């Protein structure tokens, strides 16, 4: 699906037409993507929390939230406001700097991951050409924040939770990266946009889920482990560690950990959509060609900008639908599988997933060599 949005220069020209200097107009344009990323990720968290509560209630044959707005849709917003208004307490014997720095180190890299998520050919904040490498690199920074938060709390449960989080992240970051490397070999590109375009050539049959089934399942498991979702929530196991690295946190700092967890889950779901499910592409060849042709929009006599916006909205909707399918599976997994032990977690990562990923990468590389 192609888009012709050139909104950056048009917005700058419009602001200059209003009398603003060019430097100020360019600065405003720089701030707009930042605002879009922050608001978009926050809205995504609110939707995920509401969906998880409703799906969890359905699994347990409950009603779920229903009083805060229609169907309880603003319950997550009210909970967020409650955390913001709570007092921020710092442990008397903890390290104030590390205790405060930990949540920031966790949240910032995860939010920056949105920069390279393509919702359409031109609906991406930063098409840097090495987007998938950027995501892998920056996502490895967040576990450092968890370890710092656990150490700065001066609490044995927090420290153990931070150590568990670091060990878990290292164990599953490698299989995740190897799955992505196999996709890169098949797509011949590090650009997230080019990976989607490569899958769009053959419609739904061109999705990488059919060409990389082993990598897809390993990617799903590794993503759940990276997001610390059940059955991989060992760093914050209530029965063992009270709340893990979050034990001493309250108020807005605790809310940052909460938000980071769901933002990370949404980012993982979006990359599942981009890497394996065709991203924004409609995936039905004849219908996709018709929707993206000029004949489809010419019947309403729309100008080029409106056409670009409409195709961009369609691509955004398709990407989110595919991503929320993964989110639905993640919520069902939470209420289906029991928590595993720490030794089982590490054995699964190092003794099973890593050899499987290496074998899958070897097969992919061998197949690509035969095509040369």
Curated annotation (Swiss-Prot):
It is found in: Plastid, Chloroplast thylakoid membrane. Its EC number is 7.1.1.-. InterPro entries: NADH_UbQ_OxRdtase_su1/FPO (IPR001694), NADH_UbQ_OxRdtase_su1_CS (IPR018086). GO terms for biological process: aerobic respiration; photosynthesis, light reaction. Keywords: Chloroplast, Membrane, NAD, NADP, Plastid, Plastoquinone, Quinone, Thylakoid, Translocase, Transmembrane, Transmembrane helix. GO terms for cellular component: chloroplast thylakoid membrane. Its main location: plastid. One of its GO terms (molecular function) is oxidoreductase activity, acting on NAD(P)H, quinone or similar compound as acceptor. It is an enzyme of class 7 (translocase). It is a multi-pass membrane protein. NDH shuttles electrons from NAD(P)H:plastoquinone, via FMN and iron-sulfur (Fe-S) centers, to quinones in the photosynthetic chain and possibly in a chloroplast respiratory chain. The immediate electron acceptor for the enzyme in this species is believed to be plastoquinone. Couples the redox reaction to proton translocation, and thus conserves the redox energy in a proton gradient. Belongs to the complex I subunit 1 family. NDH is composed of at least 16 different subunits, 5 of which are encoded in the nucleus. This is NAD(P)H-quinone oxidoreductase subunit 1, chloroplastic. It comes from Staurastrum punctulatum (Green alga).
């Amino acid at each position: 699906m192609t888009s012709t949005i050139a909104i950056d220069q048009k917005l700058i020209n419009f602001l200059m037409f209003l009398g603003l200097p060019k430097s100020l107009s360019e600065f405003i344009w720089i701030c707009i993507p930042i605002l879009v990323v922050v608001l978009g990720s926050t809205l995504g968290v609110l939707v995920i929390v509401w969906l998880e509560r409703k799906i969890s209630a359905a699994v347990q044959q409950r009603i779920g939230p229903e009083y805060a707005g229609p169907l309880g849709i603003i319950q997550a917003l009210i909970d967020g406001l409650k955390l913001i208004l709570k007092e921020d307490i710092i442990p008397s014997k903890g390290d104030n700097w590390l205790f405060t720095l930990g949540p920031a180190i966790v949240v910032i890299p995860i939010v920056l991951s949105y920069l390279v998520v393509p919702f359409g050919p031109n609906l991406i904040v930063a098409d840097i050409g090495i987007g998938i490498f950027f995501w892998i690199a920056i996502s490895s920074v967040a576990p450092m924040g968890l370890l710092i938060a656990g150490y700065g709390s001066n609490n044995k449960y927090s420290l153990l939770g931070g150590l568990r989080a670091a060990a878990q992240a290292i164990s599953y970051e490698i299989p995740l990266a190897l799955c992505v490397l196999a996709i890169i070999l098949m797509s011949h590109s590090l650009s997230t946009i080019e990976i989607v375009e490569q899958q769009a050539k053959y419609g739904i049959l061109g999705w990488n889920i059919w060409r990389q089934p082993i990598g897809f399942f390993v990617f799903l498991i590794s993503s759940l482990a990276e997001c610390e979702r059940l059955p991989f929530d060992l760093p914050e196991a209530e029965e063992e560690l009270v709340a893990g690295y979050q034990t001493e946190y309250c108020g807005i700092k605790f809310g940052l950990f909460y938000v980071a967890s769901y933002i990370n889950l949404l980012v993982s779901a979006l990359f599942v959509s981009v890497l394996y499910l065709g991203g924004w592409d409609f995936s039905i060849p004849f219908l996709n060609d018709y929707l993206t042709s000029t004949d489809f929009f010419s019947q309403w006599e729309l100008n080029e900008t409106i056409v670009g916006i409409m195709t961009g909205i369609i691509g955004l909707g398709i990407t989110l639908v595919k991503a929320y399918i993964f989110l639905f599976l993640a919520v069902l997994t939470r209420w289906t599988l029991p928590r595993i032990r720490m030794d089982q977690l590490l054995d699964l990562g190092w003794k099973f997933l890593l050899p499987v990923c290496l074998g899958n990468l070897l097969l992919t590389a061998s197949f690509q060599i035969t095509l040369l």
